[in-house]
């Protein structure tokens, strides 16, 4: 390291470092502002020789970066005075990451007695790219060597090294099933599955550069099978064995008849690589590959047929007259059903039957509509044949409103029957009010008088037996007093009720110029329902 020159004078033990801790933090601030002499921390750290370790901690201990500090890291590092002074050398908040060079050179100069000015020109030797990389990467307590593999470019390079074998494996494994396809194209044309089609498309995309279209030549296939059967007889007698052998022969044969490719549209990817990779495989793998490829090879043909059918359906659906029938049943997609639906639609224009009035020529929706101009039944004409008569507009509206009110009873708070009379409570005569007030006052006074007598009786009974006669007399007096107010109050109540009833009866029946709205038995009023010349007020 660069520090080796000045360590002799400043190689302090752990005990000597502790008193410098606070001083070092002050130096940290001093250096950041451009002042400050020899920093105790920089020199103490030189004795350690563990710069990236110290840097990560010291830089992160600045005022701005205490938030992001991990407290456990502080506990793990047994060098308390690492914290000061590192931030200034790294510049900015995370100075710990500036690697070893910048900080160490600065500290060397400090150790030799130089001022801070001595390490400014040495900073110029460090390119900003290096400093930025190390600033982001050096995070934990490490010696000078470990942070380099931890830096961000290193793992990406490692990943790039690990990726190529994966891509090779991906390239090597898929082609063999693709090349097995040619002999079995005509064997199993059924079982289309969508995911296999997608797989086939992906494989074709991978090998586009080497794809060549292949002709089904049926007479050639038995010859190939004869050639391969001799090979397969040595391994096993199963029928599925010749297929992997065919793969090798087919790849050779496919390369030759490339001019015939445009005759039949069954593209099959054929590459020379599979020969070296997979000369002859086990019967199980070959059968599975052949099955999958059969399924892969044929669905495109069926999908084309399906596309044709769908196109035909779309063409049949619409005509120039733009008559579409939207039905929930799936059967309507068939052309016969479409024709029937069209015939019904053509008839429907003339034979619409209303579900409300059972009349032909309009729908139930039109039957509910009203002309907004003449308020007549819906006629669907741009120019209304019945212009509105403004002379009877108000009266017609009032008639409509009254009909609505008679049909729909509104809340009882607004509508009263014709024979209702106001409640008598609101029309009390003054005498009744005075009597009620007097009653309240008298009753309260009597209750107040009775209560102390009762207390006196209880005290007399407890103290002396001679006063029993007095108590009995008082009881008698109370009993004699109690029955008197009751009939008085009853009589007054009777009088009040009689007066109220008589007052209500004496009132003449209320007369309303118009029948109450919402009255169930409202009589017919010629003013409201006049089917004659409009009413004119006399001037």
UniProtKB/Swiss-Prot annotation:
Basic and acidic residues: bias regions: 67-79, 199-208
Polar residues: bias regions: 1-11
Regions of compositional bias (Acidic residues) in chain numbering: 327-336, 456-480
Biased composition, class Gly residues, residue ranges: 90-101
Top-level taxon in the UniProt lineage: Eukaryota
Positions of modified residues (Phosphoserine): 288, 290, 332
GO MF, one example: nucleic acid binding
UniProt xrefs under SUPFAM superfamilies: Retrovirus zinc finger-like domains
Null allele phenotype: Lethality around pupal formation with rare escapers with a delayed eclosion time. Reduced size of neuroblasts and ganglion mother cells with no effect on cell size in wing imaginal disks. Grossly reduced mushroom bodies with degeneration of Kenyon cells.
Outcome after substituting residue 292 to A: Strongly reduced in vitro phosphorylation by CkIIalpha
UniProt effect for mutating residue 327 to A: Minor reduction of in vitro phosphorylation by CkIIalpha
UniProt xrefs under PANTHER family: AGL056WP, FI24008P1
Descriptive protein name: Protein mushroom body miniature
Organism of provenance: Drosophila melanogaster (Fruit fly)
Gene expressing this chain: mbm
């Amino acid at each position: 390291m660069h520090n080796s020159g000045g360590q002799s004078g400043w190689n302090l033990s752990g005990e000597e470092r502790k008193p410098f801790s606070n001083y070092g933090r002050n130096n940290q601030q001093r250096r950041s502002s451009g002042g400050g002499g020899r920093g105790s921390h920089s020199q103490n750290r030189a004795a350690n020789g563990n710069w990236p370790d110290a840097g990560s901690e010291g830089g992160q201990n600045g005022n701005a970066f205490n938030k992001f500090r991990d407290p456990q890291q502080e506990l793990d590092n047994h060098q308390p005075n690492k914290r000061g002074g590192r931030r200034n050398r790294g510049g900015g908040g995370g100075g710990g990451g500036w690697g070893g060079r910048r900080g160490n050179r600065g500290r060397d100069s400090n150790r030799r007695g130089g001022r801070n000015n001595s390490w400014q020109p040495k900073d110029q030797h460090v390119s900003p790219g290096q400093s930025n990389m190390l600033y982001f990467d050096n995070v934990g307590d490490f010696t000078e060597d470990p942070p380099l593999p931890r830096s961000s470019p290193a793992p990406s390079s490692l990943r790039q090294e690990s990726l190529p074998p994966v891509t090779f494996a991906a390239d090597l494994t898929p082609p063999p099933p693709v090349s097995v396809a040619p002999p079995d194209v005509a064997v199993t044309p059924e079982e289309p599955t969508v995911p296999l089609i997608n797989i086939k498309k992906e494989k074709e995309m991978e090998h586009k550069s080497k794809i060549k279209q292949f002709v089904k030549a049926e007479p050639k296939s038995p010859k190939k099978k004869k050639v391969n059967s001799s090979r397969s007889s040595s391994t096993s007698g199963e029928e599925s064995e010749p297929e992997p052998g065919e793969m090798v022969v087919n790849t050779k044969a496919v390369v030759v008849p490339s001019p015939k490719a445009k005759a039949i549209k069954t593209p099959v990817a054929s590459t020379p690589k599979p020969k070296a990779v997979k000369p002859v495989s086990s019967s199980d793998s070959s059968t599975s590959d052949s099955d999958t490829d059969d399924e892969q090879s044929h669905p495109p043909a069926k999908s084309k047929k399906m596309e044709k059918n769908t196109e035909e359906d779309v063409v049949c659906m619409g005509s120039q007259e733009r008559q579409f029938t939207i039905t929930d049943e799936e059967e309507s997609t068939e052309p016969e059903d479409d024709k029937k639906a069209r015939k019904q639609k053509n008839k429907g224009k003339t034979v619409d039957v209303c579900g409300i009035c059972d009349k032909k020529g309009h729908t139930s929706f039109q039957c509910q509509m009203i002309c907004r101009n003449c308020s007549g039944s819906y006629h669907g004409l741009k120019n209304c044949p019945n212009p509105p008569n403004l002379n009877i507009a108000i009266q017609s509206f009032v008639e409509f409103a009254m009909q609505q009110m008679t049909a729909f009873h509104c809340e009882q708070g607004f509508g009263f029957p014709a024979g209702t009379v106001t409640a008598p409570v609101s029309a009390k005569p003054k005498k009744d009010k005075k009597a009620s007030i007097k009653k309240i006052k008298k009753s309260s006074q009597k209750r107040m008088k009775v209560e102390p007598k009762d207390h006196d009786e209880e005290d007399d009974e407890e103290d002396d037996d001679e006063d029993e006669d007095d108590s009995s007399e008082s009881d008698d007096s109370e009993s004699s007093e109690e029955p008197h107010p009751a009939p008085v109050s009853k009589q007054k109540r009777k009088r009040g009720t009689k007066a109220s009833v008589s007052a209500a009866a004496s009132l003449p029946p209320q007369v309303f110029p118009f029948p109450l709205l919402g009255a169930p038995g409202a009589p017919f009023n010629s003013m409201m329902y006049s089917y004659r010349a409009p009413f004119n007020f006399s001037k």
